[in-house]
Curated annotation (Swiss-Prot):
Native species: Oenococcus oeni (strain ATCC BAA-331 / PSU-1)
Keyword Amino-acid biosynthesis: yes
Alphabetical list of InterPro entries matching this protein: AcetylDAP_deacetylase, Amidohydrolase, Bact_exopeptidase_dim_dom, Peptidase_M20, Peptidase_M20_dimer
Lineage: Bacteria, Bacillati, Bacillota, Bacilli, Lactobacillales
Pfam families: M20_dimer, Peptidase_M20
GO molecular function, one term: N-acetyldiaminopimelate deacetylase activity
Name the UniProt record assigns to this protein: N-acetyldiaminopimelate deacetylase
Domain of life according to the entry: Bacteria
Reactions mediated catalytically: N-acetyl-(2S,6S)-2,6-diaminopimelate + H2O = (2S,6S)-2,6-diaminopimelate + acetate
Biological pathway: Amino-acid biosynthesis; L-lysine biosynthesis via DAP pathway; LL-2,6-diaminopimelate from (S)-tetrahydrodipicolinate (acetylase route): step 3/3
The entry's keywords: Amino-acid biosynthesis, Diaminopimelate biosynthesis, Hydrolase, Lysine biosynthesis
Length: 382
C-alpha cells in the first residue's frame, strides 16, 4: 500500500501538472504509470475510444456477490494559481482548484491496498475526466463504458471541503448536492439611434425586464422546503451610448435540490422569457444545458450503512451535514446506480472551492484513504 510520503508525492505531482477536462492526457498516463506499480494479478483496466482519457480499473474479488465502484474526477479548472507553493501549477491559467488532485490520490491509495489485499467483492475505480465542464461521467455512461464485468451494483464518491477539519467525513441521506442547469438567452430586437426609440426594438429594456422578473421564479413557484436558485451572472448588450441595442445576451445558472424543482424553474423561466419577448417585439433564443449535473441523491440503503460505519469506526471523524447548493456531475451516476457521496474535509477555511489560493491540508489524504478503505472492507462483508 502507498505510504503517506508516496501519497503526498503523487498529489503534488498531480497538482503541479493540471489539465482541463477532456485534455487529461498526461494525467491519464501518470495514473497508468502508478497503477502499473501495483500487484497486477487481479487487476484489469478498461478504456474506451469515445472518452480516451478515462480509466476504469477493476480488481476481481475473491468471492464476489456484487461489484462496488468508486469514482474520482481528474480535470482541473481554467484558473491562474496564486498560492505560491513550491508545487504550484506549472501550466498557465490551469489549476487544481477543486481538489481533484486530492481525489485521484485518495483513489490511488485505496486501489494500492486492494491490489495487494484482494477484496471480497469486485472493485471498480473510475478515473473520470471532465467533471467541471463536460459531464464526463454521463458521457462515459452513454458511450457504454459500464458494461459486463465493468457494470457497478453500487457507486461511491467523495469531494474535498475546505470548510471542514482535515480528514473529517461528512454526508447525509437524501440530497447532498443540488442539480445545476446552465441558462443562455438572447433577445434580438432592432438597433437604432438613441433619439428615435420608436423606430427601434430595444433589447436592453427587454432583457432587463427579464432579469428582474425571473427573480420571482423561485419565490413564487418553488416549494420553500425544496429550495432553488436562479442567478444571472452575465449580461452583454450594446455597442455605444447613443445606439439602441438590437441584441442582448444573458447567461446564468439554475439550481435545485430536486429534479422536479429544476423542471418547474426551467418551465417558468421559459414562460417569462417568451412573454417578455412578445411584449417587446423581440426574437428569442433560449437554451438550457443540464447534462450530468443532476442532484446528487444518496441512496437510503447504502447511505444508512455508510453513516453507521463512519459513526462507529475507530479513528474516523464523522458528521451529518445539510445539503449544499454546489453541483457535481456524480449526480448523473447517483441517479443510475445506488450509492453514496460524501465530503472529505481539507481544512482551508479562508478559501473556498475554485479559489486561486486554495491550499488543502495534505494530512486529509491518508485519513480519507483509511476511512473509505475501511468502509469498503466492511461493505463487502454484508
Amino acid at each position: 500500500m502507498l505510504s503517506d510520503e508516496q501519497l503526498i508525492k503523487i498529489r503534488r505531482h498531480l497538482h503541479a501538472n493540471p489539465e482541463i477536462g477532456m485534455q487529461e492526457v498526461k494525467t491519464h498516463q501518470f495514473l497508468l504509470e502508478q497503477i502499473a506499480k501495483f500487484p497486477q494479478e487481479n487487476l484489469t483496466i478498461e478504456t474506451i475510444s469515445e472518452i480516451p482519457t478515462a480509466l476504469l480499473v477493476r480488481i476481481a474479488g475473491s468471492d464476489p456477490k456484487r461489484t462496488i465502484a468508486l469514482r474520482t474526477d481528474m480535470d482541473a479548472l481554467p484558473i491562474q494559481e496564486e498560492t505560491g507553493l513550491d508545487f504550484a501549477s506549472k501550466n498557465d491559467h490551469v489549476m487544481h482548484a477543486c481538489g481533484h488532485d486530492i481525489h485521484m490520490t485518495v483513489a490511488l491509495g485505496i486501489l494500492s491496498y486492494f491490489a495487494k489485499h484482494q477484496p471480497k467483492d469486485n472493485l471498480l475505480v473510475f478515473f473520470q475526466p471532465a467533471e467541471e465542464n463536460e459531464f464526463g461521467g454521463k458521457r462515459f455512461y452513454d458511450a457504454g463504458g459500464f458494461q459486463g464485468e465493468y457494470l457497478p451494483d453500487e457507486f461511491y464518491a467523495l469531494h474535498v471541503n475546505p470548510q471542514l477539519p482535515a480528514g473529517q467525513i461528512a454526508s447525509r441521506k437524501g440530497t447532498l448536492f443540488a442539480g445545476s442547469n446552465e441558462l443562455r438567452i438572447s433577445f434580438i430586437g432592432k438597433s437604432g439611434h438613441a433619439a428615435y426609440p420608436q423606430n427601434a426594438k430595444d433589447s436592453i429594456v427587454a432583457a432587463a425586464n427579464f432579469v428582474t422578473n425571473v427573480q420571482t421564479v423561485v419565490s413564487r413557484n418553488v416549494d420553500p422546503i425544496e429550495g432553488g436558485v436562479v442567478t444571472i451572472g452575465k449580461f452583454n448588450a450594446g455597442k455605444a451610448m447613443n445606439i439602441i441595442a438590437g441584441k442582448a445576451d444573458i447567461e446564468g445558472t439554475i439550481r435545485s435540490f430536486t429534479q422536479s424543482g429544476m423542471e418547474i424553474m426551467t418551465k417558468h423561466i421559459r414562460m417569462i422569457a417568451e412573454g417578455i419577448a412578445g411584449a417587446f417585439g423581440q426574437e428569442l433564443k433560449i437554451n438550457f444545458r443540464q447534462g450530468g449535473y443532476m442532484p446528487v441523491v444518496n441512496d437510503e440503503r447504502t447511505t444508512n450503512f455508510f453513516i453507521d460505519y463512519m459513526k462507529n469506526a475507530d479513528g474516523v471523524d464523522f458528521k451529518i451535514v445539510q445539503p449544499a447548493m454546489i453541483a457535481e456531475d456524480f449526480g448523473f451516476l447517483s441517479n443510475q446506480f445506488e450509492g453514496t457521496m460524501c465530503w472529505l474535509g481539507v481544512n482551508d477555511p479562508k478559501h473556498s472551492l475554485h479559489s486561486d489560493h486554495l491550499n488543502p491540508d495534505e494530512s486529509a489524504i491518508t485519513k480519507g484513504v483509511e476511512a473509505i478503505k475501511g468502509f469498503l472492507i466492511a461493505r463487502m462483508q454484508k
